[in-house]
A protein has these predicted regions:
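Hydrophobic structural segments
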Residues: 1-119
Length: 119
């Protein structure tokens, strides 16, 4: 059985979170690290549509490039965009791992892929 922490450990080996830029908030941001993963979604951003798709597909994890929580989350209410997303995901047992600037600068990461594509 694969759990959230297994996937986070694997991703952290490819693009260590310690390499993120100072302003960034990459890493395991929402959820239960011990939860089993049968389905996961990959997204650029965790939008309401992505969360809805995860719910419909009964996914336990969303891995995104851009962080779900970027600035400090001072409250989590349905009146706040980030708070509403976190609450909805928690209610449906969906975790979030976000790999941003650490994936940009990792060997074989986003910057390397862009350079290869551009020649």
């Amino acid at each position: 059985m694969v759990i959230i922490n297994d996937i986070y450990t694997f991703l952290n080996e490819i693009a260590p979170v310690r390499y993120q830029m100072d302003f960034d908030n990459a890493g395991f941001l929402v959820g239960d690290g011990g939860a089993a993963v049968k389905k996961a979604l990959l997204a650029l951003d965790i939008t309401d549509a992505v969360i809805t798709e995860a719910i419909e597909l009964r996914a336990q994890l969303i891995v995104s490039h851009h962080p779900l929580i970027f600035t400090p989350l001072r409250h989590a209410t349905t009146d706040d965009l980030a708070g509403r997303k976190v609450l909805t995901m928690a209610r449906h047992g969906i975790s979030a791992i976000c790999m941003h600037t650490n994936l940009d600068i990792a060997d074989g990461g986003v910057n390397d892929a862009l350079m290869a594509a551009l020649g």
